[in-house]
């Protein structure tokens, strides 16, 4: 699996993830890019789960963003509907964490589109560790969203055997 963490704080949203890909008990790649920008750099997305499945979902999600002119929530709901009802898509095993300047969502293969509490999203095998670390930093420091994501992922990589310390981190800043 992996760790994907998103923090929304002070007009900034950040999604970061590690780069480890495993096959059974073996690390097969250490620098997979599990976080990407989509829709002309207006949306960021990260995935946890099967790499091939996730890349398929990234492509489908970007098509939905184009179809619905970048409306994040509508695009996520339409992707979740297709994911849940299509015979082939239903077999894809991955989770997506997506965000634009205003909204953050988790999209699952069960058709769930979840808006997270506390402006935090954490998915994957190390998600709970990263979430706990991020909450502690939000409540007890004045770090930026990007600094929190970096430090929480670093902490997680020292605990979760399916998370490494090669990170991809993307951010969006809102003027509002």
UniProtKB/Swiss-Prot annotation:
Q: Does the keyword Protease apply?
A: yes
Keyword Ion transport annotated: no
Recorded catalytic reaction(s): these are: ATP-dependent cleavage of peptide bonds with broad specificity
> Where on the tree of life does the source sit, at the highest rank?
Bacteria
**Activity regulation, free text:** Allosterically activated by HslU binding.
Q: Which GO terms describe its cellular component?
A: HslUV protease complex; proteasome core complex
What Enzyme Commission number(s) appear in the record? 3.4.25.2
Keywords, in A-Z order: Allosteric enzyme, Cytoplasm, Hydrolase, Metal-binding, Protease, Sodium, Threonine protease
Question: Which residues does the annotation say bind Na(+)?
Answer: 157, 160, 163
Query: Example GO molecular function term?
Result: metal ion binding
User: Which EC class is this protein assigned?
Assistant: hydrolase
**Active site per UniProt:** 2
Q: Where in the cell is it found?
A: Cytoplasm
**Family matches, as SUPFAM superfamilies:** N-terminal nucleophile aminohydrolases (Ntn hydrolases)
Q: Which family does it belong to?
A: Belongs to the peptidase T1B family. HslV subfamily.
Query: Tell me, how does this one assemble?
Result: A double ring-shaped homohexamer of HslV is capped on each side by a ring-shaped HslU homohexamer. The assembly of the HslU/HslV complex is dependent on binding of ATP.
Q: What does this protein do?
A: Protease subunit of a proteasome-like degradation complex believed to be a general protein degrading machinery.
Q: What is this protein called?
A: ATP-dependent protease subunit HslV
The source organism is Buchnera aphidicola subsp. Baizongia pistaciae (strain Bp)
Q: Which gene encodes it?
A: hslV
């Amino acid at each position: 699996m992996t760790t994907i963490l998103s923090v929304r704080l002070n007009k900034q949203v950040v999604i970061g993830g590690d780069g480890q890909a495993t096959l059974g008990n073996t690390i097969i790649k250490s620098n997979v890019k599990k976080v990407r920008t989509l829709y002309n750099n207006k949306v960021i997305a990260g995935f946890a789960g099967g790499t091939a499945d996730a890349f398929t979902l990234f492509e489908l999600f970007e098509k939905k963003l184009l179809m619905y002119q970048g409306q994040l929530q509508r695009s996520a709901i339409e992707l979740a509907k297709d994911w849940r009802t299509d015979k082939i898509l239903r077999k894809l095993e991955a989770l997506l964490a997506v965000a634009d300047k205003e909204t953050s969502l988790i999209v699952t293969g069960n058709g769930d589109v979840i808006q997270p509490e506390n402006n935090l999203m954490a998915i994957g095998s190390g998600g709970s560790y990263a979430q706990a670390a991020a909450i502690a930093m939000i409540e007890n420091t004045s770090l930026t969203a990007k600094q929190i994501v970096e430090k929480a992922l670093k902490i997680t990589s020292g605990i979760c055997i399916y998370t490494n310390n090669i990170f991809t981190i993307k951010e969006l800043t809102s003027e509002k």
